[in-house]
């Protein structure tokens, strides 16, 4: 299905017996490269946004065209959401140098062949609109929280922190099966190629996002109000400037309809620092305990395969 194609039928997409996303398939997909629109994968619907502003899809039929024709898409949606990152030329799907705990040359990753083929063929890919959330959690996760809980990519969820890089990779790759998605799509932990290309897309709107992502939840963010895990008045809370406070997903300011690539939690990627046996993995983007200029969306930080309260992850979806 392409944007503007309203011929797709079908029932609620998503996981088996999932009361939020139902079972079955919404619409169809020809998966042909689209020169005049974005390909919507089987089992998903177009919600709103544009190729330039950040086109949002959802795996719940209830969200279909809710923000059609609008550049900004709200968070009051039912399904898991992804944002299209257009890539006109495969040469633009690349890693970019930003500040980090070590120099750029210390970090490495070979472009996965399946990602290259998908991005080159479809002229883009989808990235999770939010950090991965914990579907079962009724409060923020704590040390020792289960890593068998289901993932969400929705607003108002507890960030899926206290997870190792190995666990994050497994959870991201298993999301497709969890949701009973079509065999034509693949879900993965974000690579450095996908991360940096998403930043490049965002920087068409906010030119310094990779180096100063003040829209996210940082310790030095301006004071703002947010809603706790349960969407009730008693959970209306304030995050004050100068305080490091983890908050639910989708509570800050989106750029191109994407939330918190900078701030809230560091996010595990598949990039490596191979020269280190002690700290061979890479996290990106800073957290609620850091500053937005010192640890912006582009920042790289090496670490061991440990579960931390300030670290979560983000999914990508490839056609």
Model-derived features with residue positions:
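Active-site-proximal beta-strands of protease catalytic cores
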Residues: 262-272
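GGW-centered surface loops in extracellular recognition modules
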Residues: 22-93, 187
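Ser/Thr/Gly/Pro-rich low-complexity, disordered linker/stalk segments of secreted
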Residues: 1-29
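Acidic glycine-/aspartate-rich tracts in secreted/extracellular proteins
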Residues: 88-90, 130-134, 270-276, 288-289, ...
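Short, solvent-exposed loop/turn elements at domain surfaces
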Residues: 91-97, 134-140, 291-294
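Disulfide-stabilized, aromatic/cysteine-rich ligand-recognition loop
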Residues: 25-26, 163-176, 185-186, 190, ...
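Residues that flank catalytic or metal-binding motifs in active/ligand-binding sites
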Residues: 78-81, 121-123, 254-255, 261-264, ...
């Amino acid at each position: 299905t392409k944007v503007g194609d309203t011929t797709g039928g079908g029932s609620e997409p998503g996981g088996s017996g999932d009361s939020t996303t139902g079972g079955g398939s919404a619409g169809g997909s020809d998966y042909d490269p689209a020169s005049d629109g974005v390909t919507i994968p089987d089992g998903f619907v177009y919600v709103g946004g544009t190729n330039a502003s950040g086109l949002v899809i959802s795996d719940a039929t209830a969200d279909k065209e809710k923000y059609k024709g609008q550049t900004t898409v709200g968070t009051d949606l039912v399904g898991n959401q992804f944002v299209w990152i257009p890539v006109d030329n495969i040469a633009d799907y690349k890693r970019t140098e930003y500040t980090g705990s070590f120099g750029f040359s210390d970090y490495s990753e070979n472009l996965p062949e399946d990602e290259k083929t998908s991005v080159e063929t479809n002229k883009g890919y989808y990235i999770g609109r939010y950090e991965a959330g914990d579907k079962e959690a009724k409060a923020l996760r704590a040390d020792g929280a289960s890593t068998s809980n289901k993932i969400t990519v929705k607003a108002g969820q507890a960030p899926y922190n206290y997870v190792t890089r190995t666990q994050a990779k497994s959870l991201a790759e298993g999301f497709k099966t969890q949701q009973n998605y079509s065999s034509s799509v693949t879900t993965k932990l974000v690579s450095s190629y996908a991360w940096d290309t998403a930043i490049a897309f965002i920087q068409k709107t906010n030119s310094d996002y990779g180096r100063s992502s003040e829209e996210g939840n940082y310790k030095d963010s301006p004071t703002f109000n947010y809603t706790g895990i349960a969407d009730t008045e008693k959970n209306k809370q304030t995050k004050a400037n100068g305080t490091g406070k983890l908050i639910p997903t989708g509570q800050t300011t989106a750029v191109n309809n994407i939330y918190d690539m900078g701030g809230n939690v560091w996010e595990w990627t598949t990039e490596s620092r191979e020269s280190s046996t002690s700290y061979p993995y890479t996290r990106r983007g800073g957290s609620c305990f850091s500053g937005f200029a010192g640890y912006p969306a582009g920042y790289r930080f090496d670490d061991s395969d440990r579960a931390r309260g300030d670290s979560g992850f983000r999914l990508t979806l490839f056609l």
